[in-house]
Amino acid sequence: MNLIQTIEAEEIAKAGKDIPTFRPGDTLKVGVKVVEGERTRVQNFEGVCIARSNKGMGSNFTVRKMSFGEGVERVFPLYSPNIDSITVVRKGAVRRAKLYYLRGRTGKSARIAERRDYRSEAGEG
């Protein structure tokens, strides 16, 4: 491990965030800290993760949701102090790493089937 990777590993450990394991296709609820005047509140942004980039401290993920018939996408830095929480609502079964094709789809064609993890259930019992 070189010096830059060592420094990034220390910064990630110092951030102390508990980030759940998620993949593109999963439905996420991201709690974003919003500052309004002197008050700070948490606003939830719920949508489908369409992309994830793992680059140490520069890791980010893109979440897409439909809001009043319009598609809204936000790119969140994974270790941002403005992210309060990340919750996996539903796991999706997809065969691509980037789901940019969902941008051109609406309605039933934009649905993603739910992923069933049989291996984890078999390991418990």
Swiss-Prot record:
Is Ribosomal protein one of the keywords?
A: yes
Role summary: This protein is located at the 30S-50S ribosomal subunit interface and may play a role in the structure and function of the aminoacyl-tRNA binding site.
Family indicated by similarity: Belongs to the bacterial ribosomal protein bL19 family.
Keywords in alphabetical order: Ribonucleoprotein, Ribosomal protein
User: What protein name does the entry list?
Assistant: Large ribosomal subunit protein bL19
Q: Which InterPro entries match?
A: Ribosomal_bL19, Ribosomal_bL19_CS, Ribosomal_bL19_sf, Translation_prot_SH3-like_sf
**What span is annotated as the signal peptide, if there is one?**
none
Q: Which GO terms describe its molecular function?
A: structural constituent of ribosome
GO CC annotations?
cytosolic large ribosomal subunit
- Report which residue ranges the record marks as coiled coil: none
Encoding gene, per UniProt annotation = rplS
The Gene Ontology biological process terms listed for this entry are: translation
Q: Which Pfam families match?
A: Ribosomal_L19
NCBIfam families for this protein: rplS_bact
